[in-house]
Amino acid sequence: MENKLNIVIITGMSGAGKTVAIQSFEDMGYFTVDNMPPNLIEKFVGLLNTPDNKIDKVALVVDMRSRAFFEDIQSIVTELTDNGSVNFKLLFLDANDTELVSRYKETRRSHPLAIDGRTLDGITKEREILADLKNLSEVVIDTSELTPRNLRARILQKFASSTESTFRIEVMSFGFKYGLPLDADLVFDVRFLPNPHYITELRDKNGTDKEVYDYVMEHPQSEEFYENLMKMLVPILPAYKKEGKSVLTIAFGCTGGQHRSVAFAERVSAALKDKWHLNVSHRDKDRRKETVNRS
């Protein structure tokens, strides 16, 4: 392999946020594996550490409540690191006992080491077992006072390189007649604008065509809406990124998703693409054409 294989092993107290952590690494482009058996790590690394492998970032959630694994972890990491092709980091997630008990009560789950349902006893036992591993870890994060968003932001801050895209904007258009996009964070209804559908020569075109785009944008309402929209969007985008959100989906809707919403999605994406990692898509742009062709 040309580049070293970077592996982050995620472990820590049960209930401290390992699920949020693995999702955060996935958002950073890591290949992720949840609940990797400790005795399979060496074999797993061997499968990845080949000349034709294109995966260079891996995050593993490992259950390390087995004392036997602690005796092997240092030798495993040392052996794999010494060959010069693997970088290891251990991330340990912790939280105070009070917070962990509260989280277990909230989810109504039993602690995996609890005896007769006594959560605190299970936490105490687990903390004792994991003490050496915590001392071995390069990064320790106390999640006691962190929301899932705060934890995500903390992980991005510690592990994302300056060149990685940790925040992406998806701009999309859609037609209300086909339903709202379920993954949209911000939805803007542009049905108040004049509809090119009623212009014969524009009916079969869409908002990516210059004639339709110009028709939509030449109206005073369009310009006023665009200016007010950008005044709102520009200052809130950094706030979304700061909160640790990995993807923000901005959706524009019109009746059929062919003309007005497409034109606005194109204009807004063009205005934002130089500063943000951005993708634009048009869910229903060709749906009418496909329906006509099938009939």
Swiss-Prot record:
Organism of this sequence: Lactococcus lactis subsp. lactis (strain IL1403)
Gene (UniProt): yjiE
Residue positions binding ATP: G12, M13, S14, G15, A16, G17, K18, T19
Family label: Belongs to the RapZ-like family.
UniProt lineage: Bacteria, Bacillati, Bacillota, Bacilli, Lactobacillales
Name of the protein described by the UniProt record: Nucleotide-binding protein YjiE
Top-rank taxon, per record: Bacteria
Binding locations of GTP: D63, M64, R65, S66
Main function: Displays ATPase and GTPase activities.
Assigned keywords, A-Z: ATP-binding, GTP-binding, Nucleotide-binding
Alphabetical list of InterPro entries matching this protein: P-loop_NTPase, RapZ-like, RapZ-like_N, RapZ_C
Gene3D superfamilies assigned to the protein according to its UniProt record, in alphabetical order: P-loop containing nucleotide triphosphate hydrolases
One function term, GO molecular function aspect: GTP binding
Entry keyword GTP-binding: yes
HAMAP family, per the entry: RapZ_like
SUPFAM superfamilies: P-loop containing nucleoside triphosphate hydrolases
Pfam families for this protein: PapZ_C, RapZ-like_N
